[in-house]
């Protein structure tokens, strides 16, 4: 299945997301803050990134901007317990694929990840067709 990076400073959230995603047969890697997450994400190989907004060292919106400057093809799903509509809109304007409020609902996470993977597959197919 997919390789997914979970970036969140709350271990309980990382563990919950890992359990949900691994149950769906995805491979999951974790990072405990935005800086560690950015380092892992820049190495590539991830199909989707799930990222918290409020984190130490590098917050989620800064993480998103830096990752988009490096690789704008990987879908990033932002997750926040402190999110407002303005925060969600800001994240989407900066390139986030989706925005989920904490505590995350299992169905909502799975739908967002599935949609992000579908988008990634469509982008890859489009790229392949353009090369022909």
Listing of model-derived features with the role each one plays in the protein:
Residues 8, 52, 80:
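Active-site residues of response regulator receiver
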Residues 32-36, 59-62:
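Acidic catalytic/metal-coordinating carboxylates
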Residues 11-29, 43:
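Two-component/phosphorelay signaling modules centered on CheY-like receiver
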Residues 55:
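Receiver (REC) domain active-site loop signature in two-component systems and cognate sites
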Residues 44-50:
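Active-site beta3 strand of CheY-like receiver
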Residues 39, 61-73, 90:
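Short amphipathic alpha-helix used as the core "switch/output" element in two-component signaling
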């Amino acid at each position: 299945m997919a390789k997914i990076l979970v970036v969140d400073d709350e271990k309980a959230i990382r563990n919950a997301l890992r359990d949900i995603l691994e149950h769906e047969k995805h491979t999951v890697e974790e990072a405990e803050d935005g800086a560690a997450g950015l380092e892992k994400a820049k190495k590539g190989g991830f199909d989707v990134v799930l990222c918290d907004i409020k984190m130490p060292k590098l917050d989620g919106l800064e993480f998103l901007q830096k990752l988009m400057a490096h690789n704008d093809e990987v879908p990033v799903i932002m997750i926040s317990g402190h999110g407002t509509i303005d925060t969600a809109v800001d994240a989407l304007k900066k390139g986030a694929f989706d925005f989920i409020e904490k505590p995350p609902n299992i169905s909502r996470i799975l739908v967002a990840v599935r949609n992000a993977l579908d988008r990634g597959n469509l982008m890859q197919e489009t790229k392949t067709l353009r090369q022909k």
